[in-house]
Amino acid sequence: METTEQIDKYSQSGAKVLPRSALILGALLFTAVVVRFYVAFRYEVNWDEFYYLSFVHQLINGEAINSFQTFHIHFFTWLQHVSSNEVDQIIAARLVMIVFQLGTGLCIYKLCRLQCSVSGALFAVLAYFAFSFNVRMGASFRTDPIATFLVMISLFYVFRDQLTWRASVVCGVLTAVALLITLKTSLYIPTFLMTVLVCFYWTQDRVGYAKQILIYGCSILVSFAILYSWHYFTISGLSSGADAGSMLSAADKTMNQREFFPRWFYFQHSLVTDFGYWIVLLLGIAFAVFSCFNQVQINRTASLKLLSLVLLLGTLLLYRNAFPYYYAFMLAPVCVLFAVAWDGAQHYLSDKACRFFSIIIPSLFAVSIVVNGFIFPTKSTLDYQRSFIEEIHKIFPQPVAYIDRCSMISSYSKQGFFMSTWGYEDYQARGTPVIQSAIENANPVFVVANTHYLDVLGVNALNVNQSKEDEHGGSESKDWLLEQDSEALKSNYIHHWQDLFVAGKVLHFTQEDELQVMQIHIEGEYTLEGEIDILLDGQIWKSDQVRYLSKGSYQVSSASAGEVVMRWGDHLYRSENVSQSKALFTGF
């Protein structure tokens, strides 16, 4: 245990470097925050962000929604008034996520200040804001930034020894909301449990502490039940049985992995791009372990609580969805160890080594901020995505059903499955031709070929294929879909513009041709394009004329040889102003 004299001596020695270091670290931290806004306005929108936005529009449109992990939708219905363009709506949502990230930074600072200096606390927050994946994706429109902020408030509460019943109730509510927003909040449970056990063992009032933790736990359970019930009955939800099944399936899918370290590729990448971060983290862990035994820098209780934060790193070994965006969620509490590393360097290292540490590491963080906050968003911008969606709304000014990867046109009704790795694995496991079913029953008018899963439409041949360096880390060209779904897409859609395919048919006639029979699954007006006229069920259909076709079989023939195109819509608009400069999605 530290004596008062030891603490005073350490504080006085730390005061010598406090003003300058705090100023420099604060300036870098301010730059990192400014960078967040640049990233929000410029960086390419990820497929997940469109997916989360689509839940908001499903609530607005009164569509059925799975109540599992969709609690966030109640707070973002105002996005519909920001713009008709989904990219602009996501930018507005990203700005809200920045606020939550700033709140998370404040929680990290407050946690650090329980044991460490001001400079150490600022250094820890800077480490969090400078981590490469966090710079680019920490404030993206996902549920993670909200849940991270809420659970960090609760973690700060648990770390403190002075507990009150009011704080226990409030933090229980916040934790319940975090769990409703995303199930991955449960990954914090080992850290919470170890912290509670350490506090319980060393507290002088075990009965009082146990009572407050019991209130906290009960508050979580009661709040979760009440808020989930309100959420379920507010939305047009699926059956409660389906929701429970989704929850159990998600838990099994994400944690019950046969593969050890399922996202090693991204961690390996981080070891290279953020090597300074991981070195300092190891140093912080080492100082915490050392202090646990000699109690020089911090006492044993604090050391054990700080080491409990490292347990979250273990989730990388098992958690299936440890993609780059996950690191901002996982590393928030872990970054508290950076304050230990900073103060430990002042305490244990020589003046020369300490000076080297305090210059080189912040410099590496500065490089990460510039590269990931300015260079990456400048190279991978959202401009083409915004222009593409703007043209889609011009082509289809009224909402229609469609098929794509991730609900990119979020305000319209997407059909089919969410084409992430998880969604694709479930699709293959079920073996149900859901796309064929959607085409036959939901009248999807167009397809946005924004994933390699839709290569069957001939995206590669048109040289507009999407980047395969996404969740897979690379993939070979092949027919990804079930045979029935592939045939349904090829026989019902034709290329229209860039990555857009619309309902239609291409008919070939020779002079020897007799009657052809075609099947229309997607009803609506069709324009006949070509140099020849045809007979449709015995009636002349001249080139450039528009005719409404209902679902069903039709007999077609032509007196002349040639090719005609039946394209959905009345002379459907085709943009000439927007050129494709890149794929719609280029990966993380």
Report each predicted region and the residues it spans.
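Hydrophobic/aromatic-rich transmembrane helices and adjacent perimembrane loops
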Residues: 137, 144-147, 187-188, 313-350
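Membrane-interface transmembrane helices that cradle and orient dolichyl/undecaprenyl
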Residues: 113-118, 152-170, 200-204, 286-300, ...
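Membrane-lumen/periplasm interface segments of specific transmembrane helices
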Residues: 35, 212-257, 273-280, 318
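Extracytoplasmic catalytic/substrate-binding loops of multi-pass membrane glycan-assembly enzymes
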Residues: 40-55, 66-82, 87-91, 238-240, ...
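Transmembrane-helix signature of polytopic, membrane-embedded enzymes
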Residues: 108-130, 148-149, 166, 303
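Hydrophobic, aromatic-rich transmembrane alpha-helices
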Residues: 104-108, 197, 274-299, 305-313
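Extracytoplasmic
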Residues: 185, 365-508, 530-553
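Loop-to-helix entry region of an early transmembrane alpha helix in multi-pass inner-membrane enzymes
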Residues: 74, 78, 86-106, 137, ...
